[in-house]
Amino acid sequence: IEDLVAYRMQHDSLILKRQDTEIETKFGKYRLRAYQQTTNNQVHIALTKGEWKDNESVLTRINSSQMSNDILGILTGFSNNSLDKIFSLVNKEKKGAVLFINQEQHSENLISRIVELKKLQKKGNISKIPPLKMDLKDYGIGAQILHDIRIKKLKIISNNKQSRRVGITGYGLEIVEYINY
């Protein structure tokens, strides 16, 4: 699998960079790159701060998101405790990347999230929202974006337990550390 992934990374790009600009956010100045996915026209966003060398380990967060949740609103004023903590870590290190992989709802994904919501509420978790789950295509999109912004070694910002990511070396990526937030 990893050889196939490596071949596709070199020969089949699924993204086109549509915007590349500096923006001022409530977290400070960041470089925003917007990528359009060639298979479905969804737009994914990479926000970066600082510079890094080609082989340097870089603080990285990859978010599943819905653009209808207004990512730009969150960056300029709306409060989001989780993102506040993530951007605080990036600012403290003075460099890093935060990716937003667009996962606008497809019918089946929405149905499965509703089923999960019912299970959570039966357990008494009435305000907990089922997470968006990334599928393997999303990892490929994220990997192509990381390749474009020259990140190969990742210090992943996550509160989830560490798990082996199948095929990640085929993407030319290496997870060197997990950082809780």
Segments the model singles out, each with a brief description of its role:
Residues 1-181:
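Catalytic domains of riboflavin
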